[in-house]
């Protein structure tokens, strides 16, 4: 790990050599397509850095970025890193309360957004001195592009240490109030092996990367945008108001996307589209997925329908891309997240941090120091300390590791179901439910029971053409009971129109647990 490193310089400036190397393709909602070279990104991000400096932003100051996938988002990030400031990515689907919490908690001094999202910014944020507005009604704030036109083309990136703060990414809030995970510039370097292996030795000539995941989350930003730019691979940017699997395939085909990060929720929806390769002219080389466990059925479908094996990877906001698959190096075992990525010390440990032998269930942990590991929770030393047992960062995810090194995810600690003396992970049940021909999506949670402590309750979204009812519920119950242990079979099956999901596509099981009526 180098002592000095700056994300903005490494992901942009070193490729801006005057050759017109393609960096970014943007397809706007109206279908208009723009292309940006690394030379253009360098010039525009330099102007943005100069503009922010002119408004008094300096190294260490926090700058919010509230924009969807679009060129200005990439320009803003590169500028903030070059300036030595700290980027605070913000999801455009957040409401006023969520934005207020993140902007106030981070003490953001500046914000780059658009007119559509400006209206959600609450008044009275005492630290927020500057707002740049990309388009739409700027509400009297400086407009982004005219401001950049008045700024200079030259900017010398701050000589940051690899351990200097670079960005704050707020957790998705699946287990409580979102906390700001502070990452250093080195986090990009730490991600690289976890991008290269799941994408079968990324990059290769002709690679072009796209994800529907928003760049405000660690998956979109550090699994896709920044590593691709670091490797000199162009990225496709596109914002869909709502994920549509047919349009996703059409987008991939139109632009010749070779590499995709597709969250499990997206893959489950895309599985319903018939003959995608033939209909859309796909030429995918690699597909990676993470965020929720993938089922065996998705892996089988991807090989048959897409012609590629989906390589699952694993991480979290605090320490990402720790575990993954690489079909080119070792077999993808359905149900396993893969093996520890080289460069990371990963183990399954007890609650007190003792590594467990193969086959024993415990908590996935990463040992510090590690370049992908966060510096700590912003302004929350107590929560930071609670995240560790000695030098082991405890992810809170329960799994076992077999004697071949594969890690098998069982669920979050707080998602485990305790029934009749058995500790049951929801993942195996959900994987089995997804194999039933009538099931589109499924989630399993514990429900209080006076005899067993808890019973397994499954929430099921049936496929659109299926009539859900008691007969189907009994059929699904029997289907699971024949394939898993008897105590894993759901006692109750509840049909719902949709599952509650976080903005990153993770099932919010606590919300399902709180539903007292079937």
Language-model regions, residue ranges each:
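Conserved pre-ATP/AMP-binding loop-to-beta segment of ANL
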Residues: 20-22, 149-170, 177, 202-208
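Conserved AMP-binding A3 loop
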Residues: 35-39, 166-193
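Structural core segment of the AMP-binding/adenylate-forming
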Residues: 54-55, 75-78, 82-147, 160, ...
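Conserved ATP/PPi-binding loop(s) of AMP-dependent carboxylate-activating enzymes
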Residues: 340-343, 354-386, 424
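Conserved AMP-binding/adenylate-forming core of the ANL superfamily
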Residues: 24-78, 95-100, 146
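Gly/Ser/Thr-rich phosphate-binding loop
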Residues: 230, 257-261, 271-332, 345
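AMP-binding/adenylate-forming catalytic core of the ANL superfamily
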Residues: 94-97, 101, 111-114, 260, ...
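Conserved AMP-binding/adenylation subdomain of ANL enzymes
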Residues: 189-208, 216-258, 273
């Amino acid at each position: 790990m180098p002592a000095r490193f700056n994300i903005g310089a490494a992901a942009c400036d070193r490729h801006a050599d005057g050759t017109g190397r393609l960096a970014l393709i943007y397809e706007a909602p109206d279908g208009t397509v723009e292309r940006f070279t690394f030379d253009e990104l360098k010039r525009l991000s330099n102007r943005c850095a100069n503009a922010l400096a002119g408004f008094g932003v300096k190294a260490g100051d926090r700058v919010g970025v509230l924009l969807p996938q679009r060129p200005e988002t990439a320009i803003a990030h590169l500028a903030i890193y070059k300036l030595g400031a700290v980027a605070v990515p913000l999801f455009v689907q957040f409401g006023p309360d969520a934005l207020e919490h993140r902007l106030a908690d981070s003490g953001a001094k500046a914000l780059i957004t658009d007119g559509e999202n400006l209206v959600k910014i609450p008044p009275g944020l005492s630290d927020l001195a500057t707002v740049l507005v990309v388009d739409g009604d700027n509400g009297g704030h400086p407009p982004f592009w005219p401001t950049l036109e008045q700024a200079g083309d030259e900017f010398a990136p701050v000589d940051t240490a690899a351990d200097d703060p670079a960005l704050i990414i707020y957790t998705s809030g699946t287990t409580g109030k979102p906390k700001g995970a502070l990452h250093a510039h080195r986090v990009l370097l730490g991600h690289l092996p976890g991008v290269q292996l799941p994408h079968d030795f990324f990059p290769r000539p002709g690679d072009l990367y796209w994800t529907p995941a928003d760049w405000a989350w660690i998956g979109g930003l550090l699994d896709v945008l920044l590593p691709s730019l670091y490797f000199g691979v162009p990225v496709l940017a596109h914002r869909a108001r709502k994920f549509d699997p047919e349009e996703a395939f059409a987008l991939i085909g139109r632009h010749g996307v070779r590499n995709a990060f597709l969250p499990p929720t997206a893959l489950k929806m895309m599985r319903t589209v018939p003959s995608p390769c033939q209909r859309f002219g796909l030429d995918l080389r690699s597909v990676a997925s993470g965020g929720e466990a993938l089922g065996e059925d998705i892996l089988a479908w991807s090989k048959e329908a897409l012609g590629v094996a989906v390589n699952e990877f694993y991480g979290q906001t605090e320490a990402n891309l720790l575990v993954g698959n690489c079909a080119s190096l070792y077999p993808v075992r359905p149900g396993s997240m893969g093996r520890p990525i080289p460069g990371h010390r990963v183990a399954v440990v007890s609650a007190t941090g003792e590594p467990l032998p193969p086959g024993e269930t415990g908590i996935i942990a990463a040992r510090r120091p590690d370049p992908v590991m966060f510096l700590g929770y912003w302004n929350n030393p107590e929560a930071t300390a609670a995240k560790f047992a000695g030098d082991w960062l405890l992810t809170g995810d329960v799994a076992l590791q077999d004697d071949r090194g594969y890690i098998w995810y069982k669920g979050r600690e707080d998602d485990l179901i305790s029934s009749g003396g058995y500790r049951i992970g929801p993942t195996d049940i959900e994987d089995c439910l997804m194999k039933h021909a009538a099931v589109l999506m499924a989630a399993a949670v514990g429900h209080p029971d006076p005899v067993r402590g808890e019973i397994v309750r499954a929430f099921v979204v049936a496929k659109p053409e299926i009539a859900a009812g008691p007969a189907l519920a009994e059929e699904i119950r029997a289907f699971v009971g024949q394939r898993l242990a008897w105590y894993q079979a759901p006692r109750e099956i509840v049909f719902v129109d949709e599952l509650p999901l976080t903005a990153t596509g993770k099932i919010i099981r606590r919300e399902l647990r709180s539903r007292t009526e079937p």
